[in-house]
Structure formats: C-alpha cells, structure tokens
Amino acid sequence: MADPGLRSGVGLPSQQGQKHDLQKDQKQPHVNNADRTTQSLLNSYIYDYLIKKDYCEAARAFGREAQVQTLVRSQEETNSLAKRHKRMSPVAVKHEGISNNESSDENMNVNNGNLDSFSSSSAPPPPPILPIDSAGGFLIEWWNVFWDIYNARRGQGSEPAKAYMSHISNLRKKSRLNLQEIQKNSLHTGNTSHPYANASFPHDPANAMGQQIDSSQFHQGAGGLNDRNQHLMRQAMLNNQSRETFPPTAAQLQQLKQLHYRQLQSVQQQQKQHQQKKTPQSGSTPQMQNTTSQPTTHDTHPPKQQGPISDFRSIPSSPKTEGAPSNAQFRPSLPATPNGSVPQSNPLYDTTGLNGGQYPVVQNSAQPLLHEINFASNRNPHLKQGGAVPSSTLPQQQKSLDKPKPAQQPSTGQFSGNQMNQYGFSNSPYSQNMLYNFNGNANPSRLNPALKNYMEELKLLEQQNKKRLLLVSQEKERKGYTSASPDRPLSQTITESSVAKTKSTTPKSTDTPTEATTSPVKVSTKNSNTTENLNGINESNMPMLQNGLPLRTSGDHPSNYSNLIENSSTSDTNNADNGMDVMGNWQLQQTHSSRPTPNASSPLDVRSKQKPSSANSNAPTPAPTVNTTNPESSTNEATSVGPALEPSQGANVHKSDSELDNQNQSGKSNPDTSATPSAPTESTTVATKSSDNQLLDVGNSTDIDAALLNDFDFDKFLKDTSTGDDLWFGLFNLPDNEDSTAA
C-alpha cells in the first residue's frame, strides 16, 4: 500500500499541496504513521463505496478533499470507460498501481492525468488502491454482517447469525467456569490441579513473545502482601467475574496466574511461621500430648491428670486405637479442687476411647441432669431436707472412695454416679459403683451387687406382704373379731406362750355341747336383716358405740393396728362413757340364736379343719375363739364380744338362749345403754353346742402381733451388714411365724 504522503490521485498544484499538508500536520501533530495508514485505508474504502454505489459527484468531491490514492489510467481507457461505464478488475488495479519509489516528476504527471479524470463529468472517477476488494464493496459487506450479528443478540436476524451467537455464548460460559475454578483454587492452599493454574497458554502473547515475570516481584508481593491487599484482590476478581468477556485476554490470564502464585507464596509462608511457633511449644508440653494419645485398656487405670483442664462437659474426640473399648463411658471433665490439685480420675470417666458418633456431646451445660439430681437426693436424705451434709459422714464416704477397686471392663453406655461431685452433692457409698444402662439392656448380671440384693429384698418383701394380707383377711373372716383401738397402748402382760396357746386352741364342731372358753360376755344383737361388710359380719352383730354408731371392724383399720389388743382387767364401769376405750375389749363369739349367719357359707373355698377349744386361760387371748351352737339351725349365729377374764374371775355362769333374747330386747328398748358396752361385773360363760359350721384352716397364719414385733430387728433393717452404713434398707427376711399358729 502506498504511503499517504504520495497523493497520486489529487490534481492540485505542488505549492497548494504543500500548504495543505502543512495545515493538516498542524491540526494533527501527534498522529503517527500507523494511524495515518489506517485513516488513509478507511478513506479509500469510503471512496470505493461511493463509486460502487454510483455516487460519482460525491466520490469526486470526497476524493478531492480526502486525497484518496487512485489508479493511473490512459486517455483512451478513460474515454472507453466513460462510454461503457465499466469498472476495472482488482488485478488490473494492482498492476496499474504506482510504486512508492517513483520520482516526484512522474507522480506529478500521474496527478495531472488523474486531475483531468476527476474533473471530467462524463467518465466515472478512477478506482482507489485497496488491499481487499469485493464486487459489492467491502464496507457495505462488513456493515451487513455487523448489523445481522447485532440483531441476533436480541433474538432477531438470520439463522446463521443466531447459531453463531449461541456458539459464542456457550464459549463464554465455559470461559466463566474456568475463571471461577481458577479463583477457587487460588483461595485454597496448595491446590494447583487446574490446568489454567500451571499450564502455559499457547495463545498467550506473553508466552509467545518470551515475556516472563520477574521473580523478584513475586518475592516482594509474597512478603509485602497483607490481608487487606488479598481481600481487595479477591474482591476485584469477583467484580471482574460478572463481566461477560470472552475469551479471557492475555492480561487477565496473566493477572490470574500472578494472583494465584502470590497466594500460594503467602500461604506457604504462613504455614512455615505456624510450624516455627509450634516447635518451641511442643517440647514444653509433652505430658499433655501423652495424656491425649494414651490408649485405654481394660485392666489399667489412667494416670492422674495434670495441667489445665478443659471446660465443663467438653469431651475431646480422639480416633480409635487398638485395645480401646468400642463403647466408652460418657463423662465430663473432673473439676479442680480449691488447693489446685486435680482429684484422681475414675476409670469410668476415661474419654480417650470415646466413640465420637455414638453419644451426643452436650456442651456449655451448667445445670445437671434431672435424673442425676433425683438420684442424689434419693440416696442422701439430707439433700431432701435442704440441709447440709453432716461432717461425720464425710470421712466414712471418703474412706469408701479411697478403697482400691478391681479393674472393671466397661460396658455399653455406662454412666457413673460419682458425677454428682461436680454439682456440690455428697458422694453416697451406694452411688460409687452405680452403673446405668443407657441402651435399655436390663441385664441383672451387670447390676451392682448391692442394688441387686436390694431389688431381690423388695420383691421378697412384697410377696410376703401380699401373703400376710391374704392370710390375715381370711383369718379375720373366720374369727370375726374387731381390731383394737390404735389409741390404746399394747399390754405388757401378753406373753408368747399365752398367744401361741390361744391361737392353737379352737373348738371342735360336734353334735354335743363342748366346754367353752370362760369369758365375761356383753352381747349386742339386732333382729333386723342387714348387709354384710368386707369381713362377712353383719352390722347388726357389731358392737355399738355410745352415740349409736357401730364399731369399725378390723378391715377398716390399718393392718399395723390389728395387733394392738390390750388386757381390760383394770377397766371399770366408767368405760361406758368412752366408747373408743372399749373397742379393744370385744371378742367375736357365736351363740345360740335363730338369726342367719353369714359365716356359715364362706365365699372362700378352702379346706376346713376342726380345732379343739382351750380351757380357762390365765392371760387374755388376742386371737378370738368361735363357738357354734344350735344344731337345729346351723346357719344362725350371733356375735358376742367381751374382754378377757382375770384369774380372780373364775365363776362359770351358763347363759341360755332365752337370756340372750331378753338381753337383745333390752338393748333395743334402751339404745343408750346397750349400744355402749360396759365393763362386766361378774364372770359368765356361754354354753355352746356343736353345729355344722366349719372353720377355715389356713396354715402359717401371720397376725402382725407382739410376737412379730419382738422378732423384728430394726437395727438390722437400718444397717448394711457388709459396710455398716445407713442405706435405707437392710438385708433382712421377715419371719413367717410358723410357730404362731399350730397346724
């Protein structure tokens, strides 16, 4: 392409051309040769566009003003073109071009010839000198392509343009993803796996031109790059990421590589500094490292902990080691004592073999668990009362804690009761070895021996209580006596021999009258038919109080008051004023009567047995005796209750059926005197007859009486024979009192 300084196509005089060049140079003093070439090339294409669109006048004016370089044609050719209006081919243009090495005289001749062609209106303007020529014009073709692509970005345009834009958008997405991966890898330490981070780019102008980054700049950037600069660089990367630039330019790629290299250098330097800081500290604390790395075995206790202790309930998780149990115990760290020493750790508290995924770790919990507080309060009665633990129990408990214990193999989910210490609760000797089974495997073999004994004793005691309640209820239904008043004290004159003798003597059921037990009798009966109570006794046959209310039966009283039967030898006639004092002086006795007896048909189907009655006894009998009368009507009975006889009252008086009826009528006419029984003034006996009523024979009768209270050992109940401590229960077995009732 010719130099724009050689204006071959302009027919201006030499002086005018020099002046014009000087003026143009003054207007554009800083334009270099490359810019002049680009501007001259654009003017040539504009001139070519005007000629091919047949804008001849505009082309002549523009060529004259812009000094466009044109081809040199002869006069004949100019005339022929004027006639035919044909254009020359691009090959002819190249061959007819004027060389830059031609002399100025020849150029002037050419310019003069071209001036005639510009001035002639008949011939078309001469064609410009172009490197690339096209039939329709290069400028118009470029414009059509640009406009089609521009419309394709908005969804319009031709199909080829749309396909081209979709392909370009996919390439941009891939380029964006690559940039994101480079950014992520640069933020992480030592991750240079991405190809853009290490590989050299073949199309990178920096690599093609052999440009390399000075290593001193990297060292300076790694040393002087602070956190703020790194943050700014990362923010710049994020901002540049939003821009849709494809493909990434060489400057961007080089910037990414520099940033990544600087970050790697800074990270490596930080790691070296961190290792240097760790090196002097590692030698000062070898004991703590040994403590955390020591594996837990089944038959060895961990050593005493030294050094600082972690926060409450912070359990460090460590990997499993050989010999460590698969399911370790859950414990918080031990608190330090006021004098600065650390108490000896319990082997159940070892956390080096803790399975990190088995139990959830509760952190920053300042309150104890609810079941732990309840357990400690149940074990220690002083905590229930809200008082302080007496100091006398502390040495004994400390003694029990200091005892050496055999190695225990940890079981699944065990939890130690010694954890109460860190909440301020006192250690009970029973909670030292208490183990909880968190997984719900209620295996008795894994329980503590003391707890196992306690559970067995509770079961045994419950069975014995049920058995005693059943036997007492059956015997009360058979004998039909009322319980003594709980307000009156137990008589000291009752002896074991008299009690056993009285219980072992029962009357035989025969057809002939037998000898009855001598006792003063006070009978209170009614002829009306009433309902039975729980003991099978008619309310009409029950003794009456002074206010007309019947006395409560033994079933209405608590079971522990059924043995309070007292001798009434010292009672006098003033007992009628206090009905509660006479409650313990009654005994149930069957007499000859025509009223139906509910005890004749007992609801309990048990084996009955006849027992002989006893003679006059020197001591009062707490167990009542039942005598059957009236063989003609075996289902009738009347209850008579009276106190036991004194030795001085030995007279036997037989009371017939008519006397009982008269007494019953008198009791109806005067309810105030008959309802409240008075003390007997003379000894009477009741002549009994045999009947078909069968007595209940229950073996091993266990009345809770004085014999049971005498045999019961309270000291053994409140003490543990193995340790001698107060455990709220004892290793005891209640006696069955087999000798209390004769077979």
Curated annotation (Swiss-Prot):
It holds the Pfam family LisH. The keyword Nucleotidyltransferase does not apply. Residues 264-281, 501-520, 567-578, 612-631, 671-688 have a biased composition (Low complexity). One of its GO terms (cellular component) is cytoplasm. Its main location: cytoplasm. One of its GO terms (biological process) is cell adhesion. InterPro entries: LisH. The modification Phosphoserine is found at S89. Residues 38-70 form the LisH domain. Residues 98-114, 282-297, 315-353, 390-399, 408-426, 482-500, 521-544, 556-566, 586-602, 661-670 have a biased composition (Polar residues). The keyword Phosphoprotein applies. GO terms for molecular function: DNA-binding transcription factor activity, RNA polymerase II-specific; RNA polymerase II cis-regulatory region sequence-specific DNA binding. Residues 18-28 have a biased composition (Basic and acidic residues). Signal peptide: none annotated. Keywords: Cell adhesion, Cytoplasm, Nucleus, Phosphoprotein, Transcription, Transcription regulation. It is found in: Cytoplasm; Nucleus. PROSITE patterns: LISH (PS50896). Residues 1-36, 79-127, 264-361, 379-426, 476-692 are annotated as: Disordered. Belongs to the FLO8 family. Probable transcriptional regulator involved in cell adhesion. This is Adhesion defective protein 2.
